[in-house]
């Protein structure tokens, strides 16, 4: 099983398929690298090398108690890129993974990178405030933590509805999508589930985004019920120099998994990679 051991002894599991220029996928909360199966196949079939790791406390990586903050996540990512000696990398990050990508650039720069893709990602900041009126209210994050702590198995089933906008007429989500979400969520540690909410809910990545000096594609659904586009994707595209924004009309937070949306995203991703 492919493992990268971090500077503090955590074992990070990753998939490493294909050959060619590397594309590294960073998953969201509460998922793992399996969320990127369709994208991994798409890039490998197109001649790229696809890599997707499980964040600490997620999937097959070490179920640690500590280290659920973005400085640590960014350093874990740096350990992976360094261990595999990856260069000319495109980082593709979903949701919470977008914070990991942004903080990686903020802490480690873009020397190993070619480009970046932010998909339904949390930067610049999620929490609602006077400066961020379109953000998410504090009580939402409290409810997320409470759900993880009290009855997480049912909570993840309920959460999948909004994640995929299954509560909208004409939605394209399948029962398989929901089942896959639940399976991955249950592989996350309970402590990681709670602490990640504090991390992605309240961390401000504005200064990290200002350090981007590589081509960046921002993709976001305008019906994202988890990470509102007006507070995140649109603002990130304004902050990152020369970023390209693609808005998917009517699409949910689960673009990379839902039939129809995932094929569209794969086409846009490959077009961006081929530039």
UniProtKB/Swiss-Prot annotation:
The gene is bpoA1. It is an enzyme of class 1 (oxidoreductase). Keywords: Antibiotic biosynthesis, Oxidoreductase, Peroxidase. InterPro entries: AB_hydrolase, AB_hydrolase_1, AB_hydrolase_fold, Epox_hydrolase-like. Disulfide bonds: none annotated. This is Non-heme chloroperoxidase CPO-A1. The keyword Transmembrane does not apply. Belongs to the AB hydrolase superfamily. Bacterial non-heme haloperoxidase / perhydrolase family. The keyword Mitochondrion does not apply. May be a chlorinating enzyme involved in 7-chlorotetracycline biosynthesis. Able to brominate as well. Homodimer. Coiled coil: none annotated. It holds the Pfam family Abhydrolase_1. The lineage of its organism: Bacteria, Bacillati, Actinomycetota, Actinomycetes, Kitasatosporales. Its EC number is 1.11.1.-. Residues 22-255 form the AB hydrolase-1 domain. GO terms for molecular function: peroxidase activity. Brominating activity not inhibited by azide, peroxidase activity stimulated by bromide. The active site is at 95 (charge relay system), 224 (charge relay system), 253 (charge relay system).
